[in-house]
Amino acid sequence: ANGEHLILKKYRHIGFAADTDAGLVVPVVRDADRKSVRELADECAALAGKARDGKLAADDMKGGCFTISSLGGLGIRGAFTPIVNAPEVAILGISRATVQPVWNGREFSPRLVLPLSLSYDHRVIDGALGARFLLHLVKQLENLSQLLL
């Protein structure tokens, strides 16, 4: 969204928040939907290294469609409210995963729980659609072995 018009992107460039000594920057992984998990991990590591070294170019931070912000590395365990980076219309916040007792219908068993927070511009994304996206993401994360194939 640019304030007056909705711009539908035909690509999926995903930004991720990177904490540096100079402040927060958001490098962008281009065409993330066309890359394997390994390629995504390698590219994120390379961009994060450039960010830490202060060597990101302006083009490394342009064109994002969606941003992921993780405070888990800073020890934040509960959900937080990430702020959408305009002109994007959504951002996913990820907190620190912890093992918690979860009732499985018969007993409590230890389960890894990952708090997620999705913020989105309601002028563009209907609340129910946002909730369905988050539910889809949770199901994908619960079946990581399938995602990694």
Regions of interest found by a model, annotated:
Residues 1-149:
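C-terminal catalytic/motor cores of large multi-domain enzyme assemblies
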